[in-house]
């Protein structure tokens, strides 16, 4: 039975780390046969401040052709994976603004029964990665979503240290091969889980 699965990978990044994780998660979803929309959240940093960080400007230049995320992408998707940095262990304003805009969809019940997951970097070993993942998971619960963690017995999951989602240590620079493999595995597992859920619901509907 063929089951089409639509995946939205939505991220915010001023450095390459989150973008690389988002691309890896996208690859994993593709490997699992998903139709994927890779979307970036818009920038809230004033241009005057942006130009004080040439590395930020370079990332923006490289990703400016990528479509910005909208709540329509979330409504469209069977799977939504969110990625953003972890400033002081808190949720970025960019992500909070996007979540606030989903209220009409939430009230209409259009965010329930979807598969969700998250990934994040932080500058320090204990820089709040777990708190960020848990805070996003709380949002997914309020939406009525189905949260899919990493594979618990996969050595990759043990390597990155957080079963809730892919994390990395940003101060090392570019993501390590194991961190990218974890994001790829996360995208693949979320897509496979959504396909199984859709197939099961279809069978139940046929029986009914």
Question: Each predicted region: which residue ranges?
Answer:
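N-terminal beta1-alpha1-beta2 submodule of the flavodoxin-like/Rossmannoid cofactor-binding fold
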Residues: 1-110, 169-208
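Noncatalytic linker/hinge segments flanking ATPase motor cores
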Residues: 48-52, 120-128, 155-163, 189-193
